[in-house]
Curated annotation (Swiss-Prot):
GO molecular function, one term: transmembrane transporter activity
Organism: Pinus taeda (Loblolly pine)
Induction comment: By auxin in hypocotyls, root and stems but not in cotyledons and needles. To a greater degree in juvenile than mature shoots.
Protein name from the UniProt record: Auxin-induced protein 5NG4
Subcellular locations according to the entry: Membrane
């Protein structure tokens, strides 16, 4: 039994390392999406056409993999599953699509990333309300998850609202290739009216609600439909359908559907294959293995990644407030992850201590047999359950179980 517990712990440790590495890579992938999506919109790519191309490319990447790799895992497709996939697409693809609002508010890519750092708190509340996340307020692990979530959101808020003195650029780009790809960032439409800024903030907060709902809803769907790639494929498919319906009303000019430059092609390919196809697949795997709160709590790391990438690629200034916020985010992330790890550890210990025999009468007979055999000089069976008392009640000594093998010899 001890070897089984150790084996479970080793598997848990190796999987936990994979989950952390996957989530870190995922946040840097999304950070790159903030950069290239800003470039795409400033190059003139339609804010309706862009997500259509993005999700078509993602479907082209994930669809064949799901079809061939999950033939045996994929349950029968029913109307109930189709409705759930449609709702996932409505929240995760259409509802949370930041592209529709980037034209208004994405003057500094760090802002769009930072305002989304309310996602951990919203996801935590949703998951707790739906009982997908256990919160033991009276225990250390529960308090650590609550305090860590607040710290992550607070750190992201500091990065957004407090700049502080500037710090030297991490690296100032001087390559002509970089300038040619991202010269559209220095467009003339970077000054926004206050009403547009406010509208954009409200829209982004609505997207955060949709993003949190998407993360939380995937967990119960995966329990009934365990084929992860297939769920992602159906989500992208319905997302394409929904955006095509939107485009039929708001983007009727065929000229906007054309790709005019290599820069536009690069941004669309990155958004489709990296920020959608690969990212969605990694994210749903992490949700399945780590839970929705585990995935959401990594969201503030995206703010740090965007700030670093914006400083490297765009030459944006890095401020002291960003350092303070990043430290607070890291502390909060550690607290949440420690809380979840402690919760699993306590769960394993509780499961180990609560192991009971399946058939209680058989165990009663087994205990009596142990005593009778011991009285005859035979070594008792040492494979009894851990839940049996070490000192048996003396009343069992008077129990006489008739058995041919135990009859006294004349």
């Amino acid at each position: 039994m001890a070897s089984n517990i150790m084996q479970r712990c080793n598997v848990f440790m190796s999987e936990r390392v994979k989950l952390h590495a996957a989530m870190l890579a995922l946040q840097f992938g999304y950070a790159g999406f903030h950069i290239v999506s800003r470039a795409a919109l400033n190059m003139g790519v339609s804010k309706v056409v862009f997500p259509v191309y993005r999700n078509i490319l993602a479907l082209m990447l994930i669809g064949p993999c799901a079809y061939f790799l999950e033939k045996k895992e994929r349950p029968a497709l029913t109307l109930s599953f189709l409705i759930q996939f449609f709702l996932l697409a409505l929240c995760g693809i259409t509802g949370q699509s930041r592209i529709l609002s980037l034209r208004i508010v994405l003057h500094i890519p760090t802002f769009a990333s930072a305002i989304q750092n309310s996602v951990p708190a919203i996801t935590f509340i949703m998951a707790a309300a739906l009982r997908l996340e256990k919160v033991h307020i009276s225990r250390r692990d529960g308090l650590a998850k609550i305090i860590g979530t607040v710290a992550c959101v607070s750190g992201a808020t500091i990065i957004t609202l407090y700049k502080g003195p500037p710090i030297t650029h991490i690296w100032r780009p001087n390559l002509e290739v970089t300038a040619s790809y991202f010269k559209a960032f220095q467009g003339n439409d970077l000054s926004a009216k206050s009403e547009n800024w406010t509208l954009g903030c409200i829209y982004l907060l609505g997207n955060c609600l949709a993003w949190s709902g998407w993360i939380v809803l995937q967990a119960p769907v995966l329990k009934r439909y365990p084929a992860r790639l297939s769920v992602t494929s159906f989500t992208c498919f319905f997302g394409v359908i929904q955006f095509l319906i939107i485009a039929a009303f708001f983007e009727t000019d065929l000229e906007h559907w054309k790709i005019h430059s290599g820069g536009e092609l690069f941004t669309i390919l990155y958004a489709g294959f990296v920020a959608s196809g690969i990212a969605f697949s990694v994210q749903i795997w992490c949700i399945d293995r780590g839970g929705p709160v585990f995935v959401a709590v990594y969201q503030p790391v995206q703010t740090i990644a965007v700030a670093i990438m914006a400083s490297i690629i765009l030459g944006e200034q890095f401020y002291l407030g960003g350092i303070f916020g990043a430290i607070l985010i890291i502390i909060g992330l550690y607290l949440v992850l420690w809380g979840k790890s402690e919760e699993k550890r306590l769960g394993l210990l509780q499961a180990k201590s609560s192991m009971v025999p399946e058939n209680q009468p058989d165990n009663m007979d087994q205990s009596a047999t142990l005593i009778i055999n011991s009285s005859n000089g035979i070594k008792p069976n040492t494979s009894s359950s851990l839940t049996q008392p070490l000192l048996l009640d003396t009343s069992y000594k008077t129990v006489n179980i008739p058995s041919p093998s135990d009859e006294p010899q004349p």
